[in-house]
UniProtKB/Swiss-Prot annotation:
Residues 522-566 form a coiled coil. RPEL repeats lie at residues 18-43, 62-87, 106-131. Residues 345-360 have a biased composition (Low complexity). A motif (MEF2C-binding) lies at residues 12-27. One of its GO terms (molecular function) is histone deacetylase binding. This is Myocardin. It is found in: Nucleus. Changing residue 541 to T: Abolishes homodimerization. InterPro entries: Myocardin-like (IPR043451), RPEL_repeat (IPR004018), SAP_dom (IPR003034), SAP_dom_sf (IPR036361). Changing residue 534 to T: Abolishes homodimerization. The lineage of its organism: Eukaryota, Metazoa, Chordata, Craniata, Vertebrata.
């Protein structure tokens, strides 16, 4: 709840006061302070206080000195096992610990540098591999060893002049997780690799340990890259090897090579020789690791392609056994030639597209046209002549991976040479109509198990709603939208072009090339899914069409009725009767029949329709308080809101998910052209008394400011939204209504003078009453049936004629009430009688008018099944209660914020009172008592 400025300062003041009160309660007494020596004693003079302080400090000092003197020596502490027995200095053990840590880190680095690569694991049969892969590995070993020699020669020059210990301590840092050559033990390399080989016999067992652990990680060779990315420190191996390695390291002889090569750094090398040299010196082990990784990636791609080809063959065999579904040709006449055949690549399932789930819901095709707007052109017969960049471009167009060598790229493009004759449908041709239906509301609009719909083409696009591209603005739908319509019979446009049709045509057998393997079952699933989505959409469209038809009928009736009718008296509203199915709020009924307040209602009451709330009644037809429902699922063309010469409303039942209840008031509306908030609706509870006695009681009634005496049950009170949000929502609602009226007048749905008629509505005066929520049902209780405070039941016509002058006085611009927008509700302290509090604020004549109007207005209320009872006069808080969603559009100015606190719900209600909003600035309104209580709770 957003607080206004004065309330905010009041709140802060109260908070500070409560904190100060707590501090005062908890502070120590003077006796306690004197006992602790913080202040001088109360009775003794201050001269004695200083010597006493000095005495205390001297005592503590003495006790500390005594403790230090009596401290036990080091030998006794060693005997008691408090200290370790070490005769040496204390700096020696710390130096030893540092050495040990450094040695362990060094060993660990060596182990990481010498761990086996993936190819070694394959060689030693730790990772399972096919025989073809092993042969490929053997073929690449020769080239690998040559490349490693070249790198090693460069390495010698940089490593000369260093002791072998330094060289080897640098090596693990430089190689950073590198692995030795596959055949490093069999084909020894020159240079520092000799120093590494001195360790290989000793660390062979460690290699096997790490290899076995790594093989446990990789699930039977599927995640073969796991060992590369997750180096595992083997702690047991480190502990066992730490001592032996440190001894070996210090005993090694120095490098026997001559030191003359140092001059190589200072020699002049001509530029022509520089160009012939190998790439800049890189660590040989790291270069080998990169080559191994590249090889391994290629091997992975090969094995994946082999696996998927085998899977496709199996699926093909299964499908030959199964019976194929045959779909009758539905749109053979409309089909375009290019769409009859879709290019389907048998190897396209081996591309990474299958691993990337596409989002199944897109509003338009902008996403995929960017990807596949280029038509894959015909490939040249000789792919080897193409450059690598051209090959990559072709692969990009087809959505294939572009990494790898030129031969790999050529191999990937080979299958596309065979089916180059079959054109792929151009996705630029596809026309879609985006329905204003959110996909989240469709229960069947979900992706298939693999995360996306499998289309035949290699660039698999998400499903396109097969909608007609020329829906008229009036909402009339083509006749083909029927339940019995087969799969894709939803096209009203003469040239529909959708991928669904091309899919169907390829299923119909009209296409030349044979179907790809393993796609039939996927297509069947996809078609079933699409059928569900289509049924859902047709249902939604039928609902919208029905609503539009109802609106049109109602508008015509109201137009024809407008010319005949006399201008209705005050508070009269035209009500339409609807079936039970159009009620959006399925509110239950209170048990029993309503108490008949209107057995003596005169016949003229039948002329003006009875004002009853939106409810479901058990006896056939329902009288409906027509209110405007703006469903977010309806486009503006589909929800025409007509406002005609008498205050009339249109009822448009929304979808069950969106209860936006905007009750149009027929009273004066400020900027809102056509929709006013429920809170500012006119107080017309008098009319509810006119319902016939055989009808069941309504679900809610709108209490008017006519001060009835009642004590209805009070539901729990919730917090209203903030004032700024309410004002913003009001502004947007009025803008929406203006736009709707413009659209309707342009399309010819409404006469051009509807805007003037609409502005005429604002001349009718109104009294704002507390609004009611249609969703809460309260138990039936005898107290909820109000008795009229005046003598008998006053009929509607009598009330309308008699009280007009008093209403004029009430709403007069000279009275302190002022405009309708300034009217709000006020709670008055519990001690005062109902009218004493506010009558002080009015001048004498206005007070008399108010009282006479109060006596004239009858106030029987029908059974109060409401969430908002009339605000009380005899209570210490204003009763307010709202459900969050329907009431977010309320004008919260009309409620006094300070007293709508959740602490006071059990209140007896008499009647509200009306006052000028300028009174909010007065501070002596007795608004503080509930605030104090609320702050203490807070």
């Amino acid at each position: 709840m957003t607080l206004l400025g004065s309330e905010h300062s009041l709140l802060i003041r109260r908070k500070f006061r409560s904190v100060l009160q707590l501090r005062l309660q908890q502070r120590r007494t003077q006796e306690q302070l004197a006992n602790q020596g913080l202040i001088p004693p109360l009775k003794s003079p201050t001269e004695f206080h200083d010597p006493r302080k000095k005495l205390d400090s001297a005592k503590t000092e003495d006790s500390l000195r005594r403790k230090v003197r009596n401290r036990s020596d080091r030998a006794s502490l060693v005997n008691m096992h408090i200290l370790q027995a070490s005769t040496a200095e204390r700096s020696i053990p710390t130096a030893q610990m540092k050495l040990k840590r450094a040695r362990l880190a060094d060993d660990l680095n060596e182990k990481i540098a010498l761990r086996p690569g993936p190819l070694e694991l394959v060689e030693k049969n730790i990772l399972p591999m096919d025989s073809s892969v092993k042969e490929a590995i053997k073929g690449t070993e020769v080239s690998l060893s040559k490349a490693a020699d070249a790198f090693a020669f460069e390495d010698d020059s940089s490593r000369d002049g260093l002791s072998p210990d330094q060289a080897r301590s640098e090596d693990p840092q430089g190689s950073g997780g590198s692995t030795p050559d596959i055949k490093s033990t069999e084909a020894p390399l020159a240079g520092p690799l000799d120093t590494i080989q001195d360790l290989t016999p000793g660390s062979e067992s460690d290699k096997n340990d790490t290899a076995s652990q790594l093989s446990n990680q990789s699930d039977s060779g599927k995640q073969v890259l796991g060992p590369l990315s997750t180096p595992i420190p083997v702690h047991t191996a480190v502990k066992s090897k730490s001592l032996g390695d440190s001894k070996n390291r210090h005993k090694k002889p120095k490098d026997p090579k001559p030191k003359v090569k140092k001059l190589k750094y200072h020699q002049y090398i001509p530029p022509d020789q520089k160009a012939e040299k190998s790439p800049p010196p890189m660590d040989s082990a790291y270069a080998r690791l990169l080559q191994q990784q590249q090889l391994f990636l290629q091997l992975q791609i090969l094995s994946q392609q082999q696996q998927q080809q085998q899977q496709q063959q199996q699926q093909q065999q299964q499908q030959q056994q199964q019976q194929r579904f045959s779909y009758p040709g539905m749109h053979q006449a409309h089909l375009k030639e290019p769409n009859e055949q879709m290019t389907r690549n048998p190897n396209s399932s081996s591309t990474p597209l299958n691993n990337t789930p596409l989002s199944p819901v897109k509003n338009s095709l902008s996403g995929q046209t960017g990807v596949s707007s280029l038509k894959p052109g015909p490939l040249p017969p000789n792919l080897d002549d193409l450059k690598v960049s051209e090959l990559r471009q072709q692969l990009r167009i087809r959505g294939l991976p572009v990494s790898g060598t030129k031969t790999a790229l050529v191999d990937r493009l080979r299958p596309f040479q065979d089916c180059a004759g079959n054109p792929v449908p151009n996705f630029g041709d596809i026309t879609t109509v985006t329905f204003p239906v959110t996909p989240n509301t469709l229960p069947s609009y979900q992706s298939s198990p693999s995360g996306f719909y499998h289309f035949g083409s290699t660039s698999s696009s998400p499903p396109i709603s097969p909608a007609s591209s020329d829906l008229s603005a009036a909402g009339s739908l083509p006749d083909t939208f029927t339940d019995a319509s087969p799969g894709f019979g939803l096209h009203a446009s003469p040239v529909p072009a959708c991928t669904d049709e091309s899919l169907l045509s390829s299923l119909n057998g009209g296409s030349g090339p044979s179907e790809p393997d393993g796609l039939d079952s996927e297509k069947d699933k996809m078609l079933v899914e699409k059928q569900k989505v289509i049924n859902q959409l047709t249902w939604k469209l039928r609902q919208e069409q029905r609503q539009v038809e109802e609106l049109r009928m109602q508008l015509q009736k109201q137009k024809s009725g407008c010319n005949d009718q006399k201008p209705l008296p005050f508070l009269a509203t035209t009500i339409k009767q609807e079936d039970v199915s159009s009620c959006p709020f399925a509110a239950q009924q209170a048990s029993g029949k309503g108490q008949g307040h209107s057995s003596d209602s005169p016949p003229p009451a039948c002329e003006t329709a009875q004002l009853l709330p939106h409810c479901v009644e058990s006896s056939g037809q329902t009288h409906v308080l027509s209110s405007t429902f703006l469903s977010p699922q309806c486009s503006p063309q589909h929800s025409p809101l007509g406002t005609l010469k008498s205050p009339q409303h249109i009822s448009l039942p929304p979808s069950p998910n969106n209860h936006y209840f905007l009750a149009s008031s027929s009273g004066a509306q400020r900027e809102n052209h056509g929709v006013s908030s429920p809170n500012s609706s006119q107080g017309c509870a008098q009319m509810t008394g006119l319902q016939s006695s055989d009808k069941v009681g309504p679900t809610f009634s709108i209490p008017s400011p006519t001060f009835p005496k009642s004590s209805p049950t009070v539901p729990e009170i919730t917090q209203p939204p903030s004032y700024e949000d309410a004002v913003k929502q009001q502004m947007t609602r009025s803008q929406q209504m203006d736009e709707l009226l413009d659209v309707l007048i342009e399309s010819g749905e409404m006469p051009a003078d509807a805007r003037e008629d609409h502005s005429c509505l604002q001349k009718i005066p109104k009294i704002p009453g507390s609004s009611c929520s249609p969703t809460t049902i309260l138990p039936k209780s005898s107290a909820s049936f109000e008795q009229a405070s005046s003598g008998g039941q006053i009929s509607f016509d009598h009330y309308a004629t008699d009280s007009e002058e008093h209403l004029e006085v009430l709403l007069n611009s000279h009275s302190p009430i002022g405009k309708v927008s300034d009217v709000t509700l006020l709670k008055i302290g519990s001690e005062e009688p109902p009218f004493d509090g506010i009558m002080d604020g009015f001048p004498g004549k206005a007070a008399e008018d108010l009282f006479s109007a109060h006596e004239l207005l009858p106030g029987p209320l029908s059974p109060m099944h409401t969430q908002l009872s009339p605000p009380s006069v005899d209570s210490s808080g204003l009763q307010l209660s709202f459900t969050e969603s329907p009431w977010e559009t309320m004008e919260w100015l009309d409620l006094t914020p300070p007293s709508s606190t959740p602490g006071f719900s059990n209140l007896t209600s008499s009647g509200p009172s009306i006052f000028n909003i300028d009174f909010l600035d007065v501070t002596d309104l007795n608004l503080n008592s509930p605030m104090d209580l609320h702050l203490q709770q807070w």
